[in-house]
Protein backbone atom coordinates (compact mmCIF):
# COMPACT_ATOMS: atom_id res chain seq x y z
CA UNK A 1 0.00 0.00 0.00
CA UNK A 2 1.19 3.54 -0.72
CA UNK A 3 1.89 5.94 2.12
CA UNK A 4 -0.03 8.62 0.20
CA UNK A 5 -3.10 6.39 0.16
CA UNK A 6 -3.05 6.37 3.96
CA UNK A 7 -3.74 10.11 3.86
CA UNK A 8 -7.33 9.57 2.72
Curated annotation (Swiss-Prot):
GO BP annotation list: neuropeptide signaling pathway
Modified positions (Phenylalanine amide) in chain numbering: 8
GO annotation, cellular component aspect: extracellular region
Localization (cell): Secreted
Top-level taxon in the UniProt lineage: Eukaryota
Main location: secreted
Keyword annotations of the record: Amidation, Neuropeptide, Secreted
Family stated for the protein in its record: Belongs to the FARP (FMRFamide related peptide) family.
Name of protein: FMRFamide-like neuropeptide FLP2
Lineage of the organism: Eukaryota, Metazoa, Ecdysozoa, Arthropoda, Crustacea
